[in-house]
Amino acid sequence: MRVCVTGGTGFLGGALVRRLLAERVPVRVLARPSVRADELESRGVEVVRGELGDPAAVARAVRGIELVYHVAAKVDSAGKAAEFFETNVRGTEGVLAACLDAGVRRVVYESSIAVYGLVRNGEHIDENTPYDEFPKLRDFYSQSKLAADQLAVSFARKTGLPLVIMRPGIIYGPGKALPLGLLSFNLGKSNFVFGSPDLHFPLNYVENLIDAMELAANLDGDQLREFNIVDDEDLTLLRYHSTKSNVDQSRTRFFPGWPVLAAAPLVDTVMRVLPLGGTRITKHQLERSLQDRFYDTRRIRQELRWAPKVPLEESIRRSIGTHDHA
């Protein structure tokens, strides 16, 4: 089977490409002209140069391909709204259209649990939970991922394109900073986290996520499938930091979230004035971050028979020292 990976030079896409190469799967990657891909080419990866917004380049990338992993996205916080929508929404639309034209057997699209809105504290969020009703109150990344997810669902239903949408949480692993919390910072070995230590923490170790992506690629049937995925539904901030402390001897202090919420209107006003691009902090955004959000993953565990192979402590151990914490 010939496979194409968009975003194959990024964190998740790069890890996926390495996995496929280890499995001796022929891989093609769509890479931006500005990104170095010498190492991939030296390992036998076919590299197609082009932007997601270039229909000709995308068509070349998926021509003759059976399976496409669409992982490419603009994920950083800086930038204008148009930049996020060009890559994450119009880019996704272009990839799906090209895959339909090329007769691709299946597309696995990497979305995000960021598409969901406010819920009652502790309420289970599954694949039937509505999208966020107030996307304009979110940062540009979240707005664009929500719009792209909606577009992908609509496209698959209208055209019959065999599509699997994966909605992971916070992805980490070797080469990427270990997460601390949705509202957090660190100074040396000391971590400072705002919010209750009992809040659920939706994490995905990169290799566990790739296991699920490969299972999704081999699903029977052509119908649209949607999967929420986090490694441990029951993981809390307290248990995560306790486990992390056992590995790296770090110390974590928790602070109440209400002062952050109280300051949100002022901070958002300041950020609207300052030239900080896509960085936004709104009351709505902070309320989501301080809610206890339980992501229900029964569907992916039952239908794909997926379970994380790398446990939390081992995943932290593998990630320690590969990147500065953030």
Segments from the language model and where they lie:
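N-terminal Rossmann NAD(P)H-binding glycine-rich loop of SDR-like oxidoreductase domains
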Residues: 3-23
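NAD(P)H-binding glycine-rich loop region in Rossmannoid oxidoreductase-like domains
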Residues: 35-41, 45-90, 98, 102
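Conserved Rossmann-fold NAD(P)-dependent oxidoreductase catalytic core, especially the SDR/UDP-sugar
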Residues: 90, 94-140
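Flexible, glycine-rich beta-alpha linker
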Residues: 116, 140, 161-181
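Active-site Tyr-X1-5-Lys
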Residues: 136-164
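Substrate-positioning beta->alpha
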Residues: 147-148, 176-181, 194-217, 224-228
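Mid/C-terminal beta-alpha module of Rossmann-like enzyme folds, strongest
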Residues: 215-280, 297, 317-318
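Amphipathic terminal alpha-helices
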Residues: 295-303, 307-326
